[in-house]
Structures are given as structure tokens and as C-alpha cells.
């Protein structure tokens, strides 16, 4: 899990979702997991 100021999709499987006002990137590749904060 990476915490970043700006999150973006890294590959085609990445999805940006909003969970309890926190933006997240979920992906099949665990390395691509991100959270904005």
C-alpha cells in the first residue's frame, strides 16, 4: 500500500474507488495498491 498525494491508475486492471471519503486504487497486482492521504 502506497500513500500518495495524487493517485493514478498504473495498469488497465487498476480501479479508483472512494471508500469513506478516502480515494483508493485496487488492483490484481498487490504492488499497485494506493491510498490518497
Swiss-Prot record:
Top-rank taxon:
Bacteria
Q: Which family does it belong to?
A: Belongs to the bacterial ribosomal protein bL36 family.
Cite a GO CC annotation. ribonucleoprotein complex
**What organism does the UniProt record list as the source?**
Mesomycoplasma hyopneumoniae (strain 7448)
| UniProt name for this protein | Large ribosomal subunit protein bL36
Q: Which UniProt keywords apply?
A: Ribonucleoprotein, Ribosomal protein
- TM ranges are none
- Report which gene this protein is encoded by: rpmJ
Which cysteines form disulfides? none
From the UniProt record, which GO molecular function terms apply? structural constituent of ribosome
Q: Which GO terms are recorded in the biological process aspect for this UniProt protein?
A: translation
Query: Which NCBIfam families does the record cross-reference, listed alphabetically?
Result: rpmJ_bact (TIGR01022)
Keyword Cytoplasm recorded: no
Q: Which Pfam families match?
A: Ribosomal_L36
Amino acid at each position: 500500500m502506497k500513500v500518495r498525494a495524487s493517485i493514478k491508475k498504473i495498469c488497465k486492471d487498476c480501479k479508483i474507488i472512494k471508500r469513506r471519503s478516502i480515494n483508493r486504487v485496487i488492483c490484481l497486482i498487490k504492488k499497485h495498491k494506493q491510498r490518497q492521504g
